[in-house]
Structure formats: structure tokens, C-alpha cells
Amino acid sequence: MQDPIFAFSIAAVIIFIAFIADQFFKKSGIPSFILLIFAGIVLGPITNLISRNVLLPLLGTVAELTLMMVLFYGGMDINLHKLLANSGRVFIQVVLYVIPSTMLIAAFANYVLGWGWPQALIFGSIVGGETTAAVMVPLSRGLKFKEATRVFLVLESAMNSVFSVILFLTFIGFYQTGTASSYTAISSIVSNFSIGIVIGLTLSLIWVSVLAYVKQYKYTYVLTLGFLLATYVIADVFGGSALLSVLVFGVLLANHKFVETFLRRKLHIDTLKRRLFEFQGELSFLLEAFIFVFLGLIVSISLNNIFFGLLIGGMITLILLIVRGLAVSVSTFKSTISKDKKTLMLLCAQGLTPATLAVLAIGYGIPLANTFIGLVTYVIIFTNTITAVGSFFAAKHLSAA
């Protein structure tokens, strides 16, 4: 067990690094998460100041909490009309990116690496097309994209994680039983999305109405977080996408004028909404800082197979880039965000979902699961580096425009 003073010292250093990295991002366009991941690698794999094995059991919970808070914050900054206008294109993007990427990476693992199809499909679903909300939400805000592009990135990051998880669980079932059903996977995705959205809409409508009566009380923000956690749990219990439900919750809270129209009365919560947004921004920043350092801490880099890992990780990343390029070209065709197409192709950072699924694969006793973690590490590093390069050039382009 780590000494509390040591833990507090590390936490203080992480917060200082996160603040400096954020200011550096605003000046240079180089994302802060790169520096934070590197800080984690130094604290973990390089110096062994913090044990990776201590942190692995916490990954799922910490990742879920971070994604929940980041998506809620992202939803609070989305215009409802823009969301409805772009949701169809985002769905096309996710389908054309996640499914082909998963299958091509699985084929690569089977034919090139010689893995069996069950393991290859499981691995493909782990790295096949996630774009992590922990990167996309703050990055889309920091780069000052037009709103339609920002909505596209945030919504894509929420939806592709759901696709990845469902495909992963489908292929786990294939490994355990020897059978898999495409119908089951498709119906699970439709059901997951629908239930999550309906629960998010219903509970957020209720809560926005309640806020009109409790807005003058102290600790309203904490109470809102409690209801957000309840929304997440309820959506999950009923088989819906908990992440989509909290995203919808944030969107409805931000667009409370829609609720006023629905209820046919004024709620007068504009001041409260601004205060909630500011508090949520601070909390999201803190969680993002720790989760990126966390990712650096748990990466698995072995000097014995580093060249193999770099080669295979690079080839997988190349597959992702090619498929993403084609998917973005189709999904943005003749749209208002087509001008940002080249940047969208490069914003492919992976993080929380593949890292969590790779750890879950170990828990399921999947052969090669330890190899999964190593390769996932390289894919995370490569995709985040490409995203850093893409955001750097995007920042230069947007500042010049």
C-alpha cells in the first residue's frame, strides 16, 4: 500500500502538470493528454514508482466515472438542433468505421499473426474504431471547431464505445459457446441505444423540472451529480447505454428552453445552468488529468518485444487510419463539416474503452489476453500521437482562418 503523503505528492504533481499542459495546448495546439500519458509512463513502466498491478483492478471504475463526467460536460455544451441535424451522419460514421475496422484487424490477426478466429475477433473489437470521449470532448472545445464539427466528434465518441463493447461481448460469447449471431449483435445495439436515449430523456426532463424548485438551495450541483449517477445506473440496469443516457442528460440540461416549451412554463434556471457548467468543467478537467496519467501507468512495454509491438501496433493503426479516412469521406459528404474532413480523419485517439476491454479479456481467461494489453498500449500511443499532430495543424488552420 502506498504512503498517503507519497500519494498526495504524486496527485499534486499531476494537477500542476495538467494545468501547465492545458496552457501549453492553448498556445501551441499540442494536446495536453500527450504530456500526461508520458508522465504516467515515467511514474509507472520506467521508474516503477507506482505499481501497474495495483491500478489494473481500478481501471474499469475510474474509466467509467471519467467517461460519464466528460460526456455529461460535453452534452452541456451541445446545441440540440445541431445534435438532431448531425445524428444520422454520426451513426453512418460509426457503422462504417467500427465494424470494418474490427473485421479487418481480426483478419490481420488471423492471417498474419496466426491467431484463432475467436481471439482475433475479440482483439479486433477491442481496438476497432473507438475514439475516446476523454480526448475528443476537451479537444473539440479547445480547438474552437464550429459547433456542427464539435457535435460530430462528441457524439461519435459516445456511440462508437457502445458499438465496441457490444461487439466485444458478442465475440466473448462466440469464444465461450462456439456460436455467434449477427442478429443478436444488431438487436443489442438498437436496444442499447434506444433504451439509453429514452431513459436519458425521461430522467433529464424530470430533473430539469425539479431544478426550478431547488435552484436556490445550497449543494444543488452535488444533488445534480447524484441524480446523474442514478440515471447512469438505471440505464445500465434496464439494458440501455448508460453513457448515451448521461450525454442526453447533459444536452437536455443545456437546452432547457426545449423543456420549457414542452412544459409550457418558464423555469428560470439560466444562472444555475452556467454555474453547473463551470463546476462540471473543473471536475472533468481533474478526472481527465488523472485518467491519462493512469493510462500511462498501466501501459505494458517490454524491451524484449518492443520492436514487434511497434511494428504490429503501427500496422493496426494504419488499418484504422485507412478505414477512418473512407468512413469520414462518406459520412461528411456534402455536409457543412466537410471542410474539416482532413482533420476529422486524424482525430482518432483511443484510450479508455480499449484499455478497459483488454483488462476484461484477462478476466474472461482469453488466451493471448496479455498480448492484447501490450498491443493495445502501442495502438493507444500511436493514435494519440496522430491526434496530437492532427490537432496541432487544425489549431494553426483555425487560428489563421
Could you say what each language-model-derived stretch is?
Residues 1-401:
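Transmembrane helical cores of multi-pass secondary ion antiporters/exchangers
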